[in-house]
Amino acid sequence: MQIEQLQINEIDNLHQVSSVEVGQHLYWQIGNFQVHAQVLITSWVVVAILVALPATTTGNLQSIPTGTQNFIEYVLEFIRDLTRTQMGEEGYRPWVPFIGTMFLFIFASNWSGALLPWRVIQLPHGELAAPTNDINTTVALALLTSVAYFYAGLYKRGFSYFGKYIQPTPILLPINILEDFTKPLSLSFRLFGNILADELVVAVLVSLVPLIVPVPMMLLGLFTSGIQALIFATLAAAYIGESMEGHH
């Protein structure tokens, strides 16, 4: 009996360990599913900002752009040039909206973690933070990149696209298959790790020295957040362009 009781206690302890979560989360119950409310709330705010900014500033377009219109056109040209550089002149145009959406959403999400006072809003459980501070968001972006990667290859090359998995030798088939999934996932973990680390460092410094010292770290965080958005969008465009060209 004592041995059985010890085994039951060990199983209970393992169950408690497996149910441990990092931080507290707010969930919405929709049918039989639990939805991560914090990520949805902050993501909706970021999307609303991205939609409202051009909608409110481009109502009266001018042939010679000035002010906000000039800035928005500059951003669009930057995204177009980025996509064209990674994919080439042929076939890059249909992918400009996808790469642009990726870049702008990640950029705005990263900056929202430093500029918006998320923690002022009180929740029953947990606290609000940048959408890219959550691994669910970055993995979802990686999965979208994977879907776009496969779609671009199949649309451009048909079923001959799968021939790349046995190049240069069929022995590399498992590695080539794994590579297609690890490339976008590595982007997601890099983005998640950088944004989470940045917010944790700033939070620790603010708690220790709440005045001048955290400011340089916040400025550095804004810079690295922009760089992370650029890296994700650039590599996503490069992977899609690679799938259409059919070489590694």
UniProtKB/Swiss-Prot annotation:
<dbReference type="InterPro" id="IPR023011">
    <property type="entry name" value="ATP_synth_F0_asu_AS"/>
</dbReference>
<dbReference type="InterPro" id="IPR000568">
    <property type="entry name" value="ATP_synth_F0_asu"/>
</dbReference>
<keyword id="KW-0150">Chloroplast</keyword>
<dbReference type="GO" id="GO:0046933">
    <property type="term" value="F:proton-transporting ATP synthase activity, rotational mechanism"/>
</dbReference>
<keyword id="KW-0375">Hydrogen ion transport</keyword>
<feature type="transmembrane region" description="Helical">
    <location>
        <begin position="135"/>
        <end position="155"/>
    </location>
</feature>
<dbReference type="GO" id="GO:0045259">
    <property type="term" value="C:proton-transporting ATP synthase complex"/>
</dbReference>
<keyword id="KW-0934">Plastid</keyword>
<feature type="transmembrane region" description="Helical">
    <location>
        <begin position="221"/>
        <end position="241"/>
    </location>
</feature>
<keyword id="KW-0793">Thylakoid</keyword>
<keyword id="KW-0812">Transmembrane</keyword>
<keyword id="KW-0813">Transport</keyword>
<dbReference type="Pfam" id="PF00119">
    <property type="entry name" value="ATP-synt_A"/>
</dbReference>
<keyword id="KW-0406">Ion transport</keyword>
<comment type="subunit">
    <text>F-type ATPases have 2 components, CF(1) - the catalytic core - and CF(0) - the membrane proton channel. CF(1) has five subunits: alpha(3), beta(3), gamma(1), delta(1), epsilon(1). CF(0) has four main subunits: a, b, b' and c.</text>
</comment>
<dbReference type="GO" id="GO:0009535">
    <property type="term" value="C:chloroplast thylakoid membrane"/>
</dbReference>
<keyword id="KW-0472">Membrane</keyword>
<feature type="transmembrane region" description="Helical">
    <location>
        <begin position="200"/>
        <end position="220"/>
    </location>
</feature>
<dbReference type="InterPro" id="IPR045082">
    <property type="entry name" value="ATP_syn_F0_a_bact/chloroplast"/>
</dbReference>
<keyword id="KW-1133">Transmembrane helix</keyword>
<protein>
    <recommendedName>
        <fullName>ATP synthase subunit a, chloroplastic</fullName>
    </recommendedName>
</protein>
<keyword id="KW-0138">CF(0)</keyword>
<dbReference type="GO" id="GO:0005886">
    <property type="term" value="C:plasma membrane"/>
</dbReference>
<comment type="function">
    <text>Key component of the proton channel; it plays a direct role in the translocation of protons across the membrane.</text>
</comment>
<comment type="similarity">
    <text>Belongs to the ATPase A chain family.</text>
</comment>
<dbReference type="InterPro" id="IPR035908">
    <property type="entry name" value="F0_ATP_A_sf"/>
</dbReference>
<keyword id="KW-0066">ATP synthesis</keyword>
<feature type="transmembrane region" description="Helical">
    <location>
        <begin position="96"/>
        <end position="116"/>
    </location>
</feature>
